[in-house]
């Protein structure tokens, strides 16, 4: 049985003070809760304060991105060992906003995924198609390419730990979410691709999230699907009560 995982992606929101306020309130709301795995991914500047506050809780800490090198002259970048030093368990890799605004390619994403595993981090690997690709019936082609190239050369024992977030680009931050059954169909496709690359056992172990305008009102529609194991939540994760309503749903 795959344990459900709900992750908050705060994107470029929240100062250190706002992070502290959120986490203190959320810890109180979620005290004693163990059913689903909870991950909070604040901006880099808030990782230290979040790490201190989450230390003795079951809530996991994640980062929103990383570079693939251990260290070096890469101005503005953050390395995997820096994230491990801050007690991060997860790191989001390949988010569509990174692909879109910062021209991240499948090859770069593959390097980041390999590096994350090398340094003991678990990637939340994002895939998803654009609206025009969906309209042209290219969803399967796009997802297949992203998954195959993103996971190329990875060991089976690492792949089975990965979390894959299906985030249709047209649903992110737009208020338009995919229908539960459509998201479930793509999640099933992802498992099929993984089983072809590795085997059925691996494809059944990986956890697949849905992301894209998830909120307390529609979360149950996604979590009730048999191929979907959680959610990567954007805007609705910025308020403690809203995020808690999603987690406990």
Curated annotation (Swiss-Prot):
Active site per the UniProt annotation: 95 (electrophile), 167 (proton acceptor)
A Pfam family reported for this protein in Swiss-Prot or TrEMBL: TIM
Superkingdom of the organism of origin: Bacteria
Main enzyme class: isomerase
Reaction equation(s) it catalyzes: D-glyceraldehyde 3-phosphate = dihydroxyacetone phosphate
Residues binding substrate, per UniProt: 9-11, 173, 213, 234-235
Pathway participation: Carbohydrate biosynthesis; gluconeogenesis; Carbohydrate degradation; glycolysis; D-glyceraldehyde 3-phosphate from glycerone phosphate: step 1/1
Compartment(s) where it occurs, according to its Swiss-Prot or TrEMBL record: Cytoplasm
GO process terms (BP): gluconeogenesis; glyceraldehyde-3-phosphate biosynthetic process; glycerol catabolic process; glycolytic process
Known partners and oligomeric status: Homodimer.
Family membership noted in the UniProt record: Belongs to the triosephosphate isomerase family.
Protein name (database record): Triosephosphate isomerase
Source organism: Dictyoglomus thermophilum (strain ATCC 35947 / DSM 3960 / H-6-12)
Gene name tied to this protein: tpiA
């Amino acid at each position: 049985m795959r344990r459900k995982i709900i992750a908050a992606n705060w994107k470029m929101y929240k100062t250190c003070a706002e992070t502290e306020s959120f986490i203190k309130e959320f810890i109180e709301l979620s005290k004693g809760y163990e059913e689903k795995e909870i991950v909070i991914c604040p901006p880099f500047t808030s990782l230290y304060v979040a790490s201190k506050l989450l230390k003795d809780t079951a809530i996991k800490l994640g980062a929103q991105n990383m570079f693939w090198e251990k260290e070096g002259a890469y101005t503005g970048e953050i390395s995997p060992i820096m994230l491990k030093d801050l007690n991060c368990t997860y790191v989001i890799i390949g988010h569509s906003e990174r692909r879109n605004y910062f021209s991240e390619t499948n090859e770069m994403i593959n390097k980041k995924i390999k590096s994350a595993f090398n340094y003991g981090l678990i990637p939340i690997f994002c895939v998803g198609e654009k609206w025009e690709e969906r309209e042209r019936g290219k969803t399967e082609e796009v997802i297949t390419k992203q998954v195959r190239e993103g996971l190329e050369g990875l060991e089976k024992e690492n792949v089975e730990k990965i979390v894959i977030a299906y985030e249709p680009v047209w649903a992110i931050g737009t208020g338009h979410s995919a229908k539960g059954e459509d998201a479930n169909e793509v999640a099933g496709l992802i498992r099929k691709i993984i089983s072809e690359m590795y085997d059925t056992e691996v494809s059944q172990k990986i956890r697949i999230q849905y992301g894209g305008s998830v909120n307390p009102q529609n979360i149950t529609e996604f979590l009730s699907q048999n191929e979907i194991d959680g959610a990567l939540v954007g805007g609705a994760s910025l308020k403690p009560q809203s995020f808690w309503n999603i987690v406990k749903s």
